[in-house]
Amino acid sequence: MFSLTSAMQYYLYSHPTDMRRSFYTLSGMITNLMGRNVQDGDVYIFINRPRTSMKILHMECGGLVIYHMKLESGCFKLPVFDQSTNTFQTSWQDLMMMVQGVMSDEKVKKKRRKKLRNSR
C-alpha cells in the first residue's frame, strides 16, 4: 500500500543512481552520502541517469519499503535545484506530479500526445 503523505519530509538524491541497488545499498547512501538517518521516517527518492526509473525508500513500522517506478517512454523532470543548500527542493506535490507524469519535459508530453492520437 502506498502510505506516503504530505506530512513527510522528501529528499531527492542529487546524483544518478544505479537502479540495481536495493535496501542495504540505498540505506548506506542515505547515511554516508546524504548524512541522514533512514530510520527517521523521511522519504528518499533516487532516479537513474536517463531519468526513466525512480526508487522511493522509506521506513515504516514494519521495516524498509521500496517503491520502484519505470516509465515506458519519456523521462522524469527533476525539481528545481537549490544551490544554497545543494539539494533539490522536493515536496509531496512534486513527487505526485512526477509519479503521475504531470511533471515531465515538454518533448515527452508531445510524444505521449502523438502516441495517443495515433492509437485512436
Predicted regions and their residues:
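Polybasic/polar functional segments that serve as interface/processing modules
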Residues: M1-R120
